[in-house]
Amino acid sequence: MAAMADKVVVKKTTTRRRGRSNSRSRSRSRSRSRTKKTVKIIEKKPEKSILKKIDQAERRDAKQLRRIRKKVQGPPVNSRMTTVVTLGQITGNKDNTLERKHKCFLNPLLMKSQETGQTATPLSVRASQYNLWKLSRLHVRLIPLAGKANILGSVVFLDLEQEANTAGPESVDTIKARPHVEVPIGSKTVWKVHPRSALGPRQGWWNVDPGDSPTDSLGPALNMWTYLQTVNALQSAGGTQTPYTSALFLVEVLVTYEFSNYGPKPALSQMVSDSFPPASGSTATLKNTSDGAVAIQLSGAIARKMEEVEPKGRRSNAQTSGVGEVFWAVSTEVVNTVADAIPGWGWLLKGGWFVLRKIFGAANDQNGTYLIYSSVADAQGDNRIYTSVKQTQLTSSRINLVQLTQPNVNQAAVGGSVGAANSIYLPLPQADDQYTPYFVYNFQGERVSTTETGVFCLAAIPAATTSSRYNNQITTPSIGYRNASGTGTSFLLDAASWWNILDVTQTGVLFGQPRLGVGVMQTMKTLKQHIKDYTEPAIQKYYPGTTNLDEQLKQRLNLAEGDPVISMGDTNGRRAALFYRTSDEKYILFFSTTEDPGAQYQNLKMLYFWNWSYSDTKQQFLDHLRTVQFANLDDSQPAPYDSDDDDLSDVTSLFEQADLGDETDFKFNMSIQTSKHLEEEKNYWKNQCERMMMEKALSGTSQPLVRFEKAGPRADQSSASGHS
């Protein structure tokens, strides 16, 4: 239409004039024509196209729309970051159930690998500098780590959970009702999640700091699941295929985050995101608190990691009572038998995700007790779960731990630790719980076997009560335990009439054997990490069936079958036993004396107790025992220093070339014979002495004071003058 409107219009017109009559009677002039034709060319101005008018109107409307959006859609984007984050592995499933492998919040502070720990990432550092975030791109990549030809039986699910801060019953149907992707084993997949699925509550924006409002900060979460048992087709045991629990996929995400409202909070970049495999000494046990709330008691590496962020009440600046300020998210695999330990709340454990908050107090600090919540909102309001639970081990599989809040956001972390303060280490019973690599170890942190006698020594000032002293003659006393095959056996104690049950929990320490030279290796608190490690030869399981003690004495000991027991002996060769009573987590030292220790134990003088090998006799125990570290055992006696004097005197050395070796200095070796400066110094003083002696001789002295003779090959020739 625009082309047609711009055409030039040519208009042809013919003008006819009324002529005269064609009468022949009138002559016709040659100068006059009969008909006059004219052609007019009219060029019209091109009219505006209708489409151009529409385009102008659209541009005007878009400009007005942008102005309106600036008013209603929040702050502008101040920073944008695109990066790839490796979230971790998806492993195989050992049962025919739905197992959660990980739950990763889309908050950029929490978008970390499962093994990052407390290390800052580029994304978390950028996010800690702003107050608002939103996600404009999310591509999830699954890289296969196992082939589909050999690994069979399972399917992997990924889903995006909008209401991620609340736990709920989970099944395959609930996963498929959300935005999800289903991936068979061995397939490389890229899942492109639409950004509208991650819009925040404030015109698409979320808060960065979860401590402000966790429900408005954490955002959606990416869940990773494995459904049905994973088996290895190439392996079988007893006719059945072996479950495959190793890695199936590596999960990576390509993300683009937008940030706004600059406000740096350095400590947010180093919130904990860690994974803890099952290990000896690490436990997670369900229990009830004193008010009946459901809690979990943690020990081992996961408890130490949480206490680094939230220290115990023994520190000068630490919380001493109430509920902690840090929220923790735990995701793990929970079997159905364990889920039944919480009546009515089994779905919470089956879902494999819940929130924890530490409960402070003297008893809770010692045990590492954390309250369980079903959502972040319940944790924020301290809405506890009240039901009677069975005290049972929660899980024996990997536990993923994520720190959701950070109370002190403006304290920059130093050396990978957020909010670390100077701890009170002394007195030793009040020292912070520390990590020790093994039961007995050397300076390199290497394990030292406890098979031999005298590998470690117990020293303590024990605590006693009125029931600690027991008087009755026992002729063949013994302590029963189960050996490696599970058979009940025992080790004998000395026959005696006085028996002592002393508590060494507070003051007991373990020394390494003298040849190690490590000194104190464990307190009774750190020993809890290893006291249930029955792979150590020194630690056995108590068995009352083969224990020969008075029944009243057994009742006072109050031991349960399976409690750890260690064979000990003092330096006099009197055998004893060290028990760890699991009912109240006390260390009990049990031994006999030949005389009454006294009503208040005023007559007892404590000795050191050393570990006694179960296969050693009393004489072998005493022969192996070493109580002094002899440092120069392999050193030879140093040779006496030879201080032979030189034949030349100090004065003569100024004039003669002494046969001296190279003398070692702190920077270099200097040769006296070849030193130019020393040669000049010697000649100067020689000339001075010659001049002084000559002046003295010429002053009238009858006898020469000094006779100078030449050295060298001509030394045997006498001087002609007798004087220089």
From Swiss-Prot:
Keyword terms, alphabetized: Capsid protein, Host-virus interaction, Inhibition of host complement factors by virus, T=1 icosahedral capsid protein, Viral immunoevasion, Virion
Residue span of region P2 globular domain: 423-629
Annotated GO CC locations: T=1 icosahedral viral capsid
Renumbered residue ranges of the record's region Acidic: 630-724
Chief place where the protein resides: virion
Signal peptide: none
Stretch list, region Disordered: 1-39, 700-724
Places the protein is found: Virion
One Pfam family named in its UniProt record: Astro_capsid_N
GO biological process assignments: symbiont-mediated suppression of host complement activation
InterPro entries referenced in this protein's UniProt entry, alphabetically: Astro_capsid_N, Viral_coat, VP90_C
Cited function: Self-assembles to form an icosahedral T=3 immature capsid.
Domain description: Contains the P2 globular region.
UniProt record similarity statement: Belongs to the astroviridae capsid polyprotein family.
Official protein name in the record: Capsid polyprotein VP90
Organism encoding this protein: Turkey astrovirus 2
Lineage of origin: Viruses, Riboviria, Orthornavirae, Pisuviricota, Stelpaviricetes
